[in-house]
Amino acid sequence: MKFFADRHKIDYPMLGDPDSTIIKAYGVLNPEATGMQKGFARPGYFFIDARGIIREKYFDPKYRERITGNSLIAKLFPELGEEVTDTVEAPFLKLALEQSDRIGVPGSHITLVAEVQLPPDVHVYAPGAQGYKPIKLELDPVAQLELKPALYPQSHVLYFAELKERVPVFDGTFRITQDVKVNTGAEFWGSLGKDGKIFTITGKLDYQACNKTTCFKPTSVPVKWSLQVVPLDRVRAPEDIRHK
């Protein structure tokens, strides 16, 4: 563990568990692991509060697929978890493009974010609004990346007395998130080389902005993120300190 931490310049405390005592206590021992992997835990995360109580846990059903630490922080604490990669000036709103990670590995789940800031008294329509143009984040397909469905925040209902309509809307500042999963196939692993590959993720944000008196023309704004995918770290520790 020290060999790994030194190579990756990890300076926070790490827990050694040579007999898998802690792993078993948390119920995450992988009973199917054999050989050098015997005693390993199933990879995942626990969110533990200051009193030692488990508040959340995150485990993926497939061993090679997992959410990144930054992506997890982005879900638990959105104000801490993303890095702004671009700011877009668009009609009737400000758009900040963020992502949990700039670098991933095969199997990583990366979170992309479109943070929308609307002026006072301006709203956009939420998914499900009838007769209007709801806001929609739409990404273009990218080979080797699986695009998960976009997630929208909770909307609220705006009542138009003149029309006797109730319509779901967003206003103020809100975030649309979309996870991207990197391919885990062996052929893709082999194609990455030493420095990996850079993938450009493009798409658009469609919306229709309105104020108290006017609904403006539907608008589409281009969006773009960049993700570098690097090969997994396969460097082994010296033989005399390897896990037996």
Give the predicted meaning of each segment:
Residues 1-42:
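Short, internal strand/loop/helix patches
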Residues 6, 27, 53, 77-81, ...:
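Sec-exported extracytoplasmic/periplasmic mature domains
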Residues 17, 48-49, 212:
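Short, acidic, Ser/Thr-enriched surface-loop or helix-capping motifs
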Residues 19-20, 51, 142, 183:
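Solvent-exposed coil/turn segments that connect beta secondary-structure elements
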Residues 37-97:
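Thiol-/selenol-based redox modules, centered on thioredoxin-like
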Residues 73-244:
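Extracellular/lumen-exposed scaffold segments
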